[in-house]
Curated annotation (Swiss-Prot):
NCBIfam families according to UniProt: F_box_assoc_1
Annotated CDD domains: F-box_AtFBW1-like, Jacalin
Entry annotated with the keyword Phosphoprotein: no
UniProt signal peptide: none
Superkingdom to which the source organism belongs: Eukaryota
Protein name per its UniProtKB record: Jacalin-related lectin 38
InterPro entries associated with the record: F-box-assoc_dom_typ1, F-box-assoc_interact_dom, F-box-like_dom_sf, F-box_dom, Jacalin-like_lectin_dom, Jacalin-like_lectin_dom_plant, Jacalin-like_lectin_dom_sf, SCF_F-box_component
Organism taxonomic ancestry: Eukaryota, Viridiplantae, Streptophyta, Embryophyta, Tracheophyta
UniProt keyword terms in alphabetical order: Kelch repeat, Lectin, Repeat
Gene Ontology MF terms: carbohydrate binding
Pfam families for this protein: F-box, FBA_1, Jacalin
Organism per entry: Arabidopsis thaliana
Residues in Kelch repeats: 145-190, 326-373, 486-521
Domain F-box: 2-48
Amino acid sequence: MMQPDHDLPYDLEGEILSHLPIQILARFRCVCKRWNTLFKERRFFNSDLGLARPQFILLAESKICSVDVNLDGPSIEVHNLPSDIPGYKLYMPMHVEYCDGLFLYATCYGIGICNPWLRQIRWFKSSYEGYDFSGMGYDNSRQDKHYKILGSYCTNTTMNASVTELGSDAWKSYEFAFHSWNLSMSPYSVSLNGNLYWVAYNHESRDYFIQSFDFSTVSFKHYCILPTKNGHRQCDGRSLAIFREDRFSFLEQEIYNTRNIEIWVTKETIKNGDGEAVEWVNLMSVLVPEWSSLSVNYYPPSYFVDEDKVGLTLVICCYNKEGKAYIYIAKGDKFHEIEIKDLVEYNPRHRTYFPNLIQVPTFTMSGRSITQHQVESRFAPLRGIQVSVGVGGDEWDDGFFDNVKEIIIHTNSLGIIFVKFYYRNGNVRVAGAAHGDSTETRGLMVPDDDYIEAVQGTYTESHITSMAFRLHKGNRSLRFGFFEGMSFVLGGARGSKIIGFYGRSSDLYLTAFGVHFSPLP
């Protein structure tokens, strides 16, 4: 006789789910209303936050992507993220901050808040002008979190700051005496327990220290001295990060001689208030091999320290001497470096990110809901359509640009085996990565006064057999490949403009193909 089903106690159910990998939990949100509600509770995602290995978020002009590092191998996986930023144009200044599992994007058109893991972005307009976007935190004296944004700029004698609640357009301005320090050594903040922290430099004492900002008291404060070995050398690489969720870690990299890396961590949990009693301990030292392309840059490296039963592993994301994005992994006497080939641009920005299930907060403004033209919610990847046929191979995405400039393709007796595209951003010609393996190619140039409107072709169950590119002015290219299988057409309505490509390539064929497009401006 079958026994009746009994629900597990709510707390026990939550405890079991919190020990599952976050990759699975993200898919479980749609199983039932009960679990979806559970995942939104702060007690749940606070307990789950430390279970996921950190990732890196990279921001280039053409796209935003996340990099997941597999330490067994090692290897990396690159995933494209929503990057439809309202009003964004090429080379427009954009500041990026990270707080409490959420990313902040700030441009002159407004401010966005994003959870890359849940693929959620919300935007609101703001009259945010004249200040550097300095970070997001909250008043930790209140029980509920109300996120606030800090903007600031320095003069010779004062630090001018402006604070607003997330979603509001009312900024309150403050002025602080300037005591021979600045935040120029730290292009981004570190948020912990609602407060903001930066690596700062005192020009009089020539010391590096942590500068803090407390949203509950609206005040800047000298928090604690940093354990630098070469305090007088401003050109060394220095980076502040979170360790074990409640402590600081500090990376220092020598620019001369050995380029050695030292990692320091705070001995105890970081608490709000006075930090003069903070103690630092040296966690690990890394000897960078002479053959490594790792270099010291003005933009500090993003990193995290992984702990397991075997030992400590330092994982760094930064760009190398040539400006190419790399992942560097140091464990014991082994040192690895992996190029992030999905990014074709140089010197991308990067941040460490802890995957989580924290929901992007909704906004209110002056007691009313923000209207549709003030905020947008985006839960989907980049605009694009695709034909996906065969299996196997490596997924790739060139991103999106102003226009497509040149197409390089190679075929054999069965179909398309190689593609490579050149793009244009402003007056800059950008080379996409090569997809496939070939030495013999055919090309198509796109005139400066024209653009690709659609891609037509054929495919079988295993691969793309042919492609032709339709230009807006009515000229169709020669067909590449062999007309065999089912037909496809990729593109938007008449007048839409293709601005990038993505797909999947195996050692033998092009097995999937897609386009990014936008309406004609």
